[in-house]
């Protein structure tokens, strides 16, 4: 029997329905609501079949945390489970497709790449979404185009070239202090061992901050951003490893996690608005201030602006720092390659009209290929963040429905033997000589794929190459004796947490 409130509502709307009709209508509406709710969280596995009606394999455990803490083990487990076929993993309540072969990636991006989109909050829940859910890397459609129209000019190839002098000054200063506070000392004079991941992270923070804040950047800013980076790392740890913060209702409660997020967002907003004000009052060149014009024009929201700068700075600090540290480690392990690189650098410097800008801009040098090879062999992340296809696909023989969140096993893709040969695990930069980039277009994830390539790609390449030149000018790199317990660490973060120690000896 309908309640008085329901009867009053129906009477007020002048509708006359039989009681059984009301019940049926309510049941239909409830069914639709339940269906929509479930379909927004689950991908139906019935659709994931091949032509023989065999279902795609599914990894049994929730991978929400382990893809960040045990990525290498998950990659191997996925290969053991499905072999050369794509497979499904669970990320909380969502299911995601894992692809890892060039043909998988090519089909995933075929025809509808420009219509791909990112799942809400990266499929990581409300807390992660509060931090980065509205950054430019997570936007799509018109919002993405408008945001990129304001951001791209400030991080273009041309803009990165204009920052070279400032980057060089910062890098030279960093190299001059590299011997301070070593992790280990040597009995040999001026020889020391350094935790290069930590030191390279410091350089990344300074350099990327300069690319964002330009002439407003100061030592005071550096100290503040260092503190903010520590706060950001705590938030990332909570977002990745705390199930409770996936709920937006939990995040409304006065918890320690909420206080952490509120503190970061309040300080981050105040800092950036202060930099914009300073740039305008003092007439200083500041890329962040130029991007902020997009907020004033209504093309970007303030959260989109702030989260995009967060993505550019705090996320990329870890990635850029890891890439640089691993290049030094690879060169330390391969003395022959290190000598060849030094010889190339000397040969280019001896050429008439040589400029460092022209050299680091070349895409066919051992310097450039050493950078690519290091990223290929030791990627900063084992798995990408999810991205959804707009139309149905046929990947690895399986029928993949539209709107399937998909992640890439970067380590397996970057070492696919069909492109890189049987020695795909080896650090061999010379393999790129004579290799048409079109050959590995879908077989190598470095700065992202398609239109969503890293916004800071141009700046990162300049910083990384200038740092390699500066370090190899002053030092030769060597492998120190290993200490017990060194290796990859099972800790949460955007990048793989590795011990990266290098021994530095004065260059002769």
Curated annotation (Swiss-Prot):
Cofactor: heme
EC identifiers of the protein: 1.-.-.-
Effect of a null allele: Leads to normal accumulation of leporin C accumulated but to 30-fold reduced production of leporin B.
Claim: DNA damage is one of the keywords in the record: no
Domain of life the protein comes from: Eukaryota
GO biological-process terms attached to the record: secondary metabolite biosynthetic process
Entries under Pfam families matching the protein: p450
Cystine connections: none
Gene3D superfamilies on file: Cytochrome P450
Any one GO molecular-function label of the UniProt entry: oxidoreductase activity, acting on paired donors, with incorporation or reduction of molecular oxygen
Top-level enzyme category: oxidoreductase
InterPro entries: Cyt_P450 (IPR001128), Cyt_P450_sf (IPR036396), Cytochrome_P450_monoxygenase (IPR050121)
CDD domains: CYP_GliC-like
Statement: the UniProt record of this protein carries the keyword Chaperone: no
Residues at which heme binds: 454
Record localization: Membrane
Chief localisation class: membrane
Glycosylation positions in this chain: 53, 416
One Gene Ontology cellular component: membrane
Transmembrane segments: 22-42
Keyword annotations of the record: Glycoprotein, Iron, Membrane, Metal-binding, Monooxygenase, Oxidoreductase, Transmembrane, Transmembrane helix
Function: Cytochrome P450 monooxygenase; part of the gene cluster 23 that mediates the biosynthesis of a family of 2-pyridones known as leporins. The hybrid PKS-NRPS synthetase lepA and the enoyl reductase lepG are responsible for fusion of phenylalanine with a hexaketide and subsequent release of the stable tetramic acid precursor, pre-leporin C. Because lepA lacks a designated enoylreductase (ER) domain, the required activity is provided the enoyl reductase lepG. It is possible that the dehydrogenase lepF also participates in production of pre-leporin C.
Family: Belongs to the cytochrome P450 family.
Listed name of the protein: Cytochrome P450 monooxygenase lepD
